[in-house]
Amino acid sequence: MVVVGAPSEATPSTSKNTDAYFKTLKNYNAFAKANSSRKKVLYVGANNGILHAFDANTGQELWGFVPPLLAGNLPTMINTALNTDKEGGSNAIYGVDGSPVVSNLFIQSPLSVGGAKEWRTILMAPYGRGGAGFSVLDVTVPDRPIHYYSIYNDKLNKKVHVITHRAEISSYDYDSIPSEYDYTKLGQTWSSPRIARIPNSGA
């Protein structure tokens, strides 16, 4: 569970190799000011397979997100053998069972004009007991979330499944998987994700 509101402005810094210096360099404060009136939202995963977004002030649900690679589990939530007097009950399918993490990142997003990098608020939702995978969403505008991609490691069939923001699904066999999608060692994602800036070919 995580509560996200307006981004805080960064403290100016001239000390290199710090987050504060990077934010100063990339004009983070302009992004913070542009989103200063953003509503406060509570994001929480549930064992019904859905990531829920609630208005933190009113408690009203804004939307729910079902990871596309886990949607096939939804029918198993109904169990007619339970609570037979009331025509059945429900099983926990977990789904988005991990703790979501949110961070403001300077990235080249699918929404970027001309491929330029920009500041976006990114939510990463691990599946926890729901499976060996995670989903990444853009929640810069809380009422209009954007699914960037989801990854799921299917250990039973020895495949890694990837779905993009264009709803394009790719499945890679363990023995022929591209290095950028080599999540063959990924297990159930119980730990909170760590989002960090690292060197990448000078980018």
Q: Where do the protein language model's features map onto the residues?
A:
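A fold-level detector for beta-propeller and closely related beta-sheet-rich head/sensor domains
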Residues: 2-203
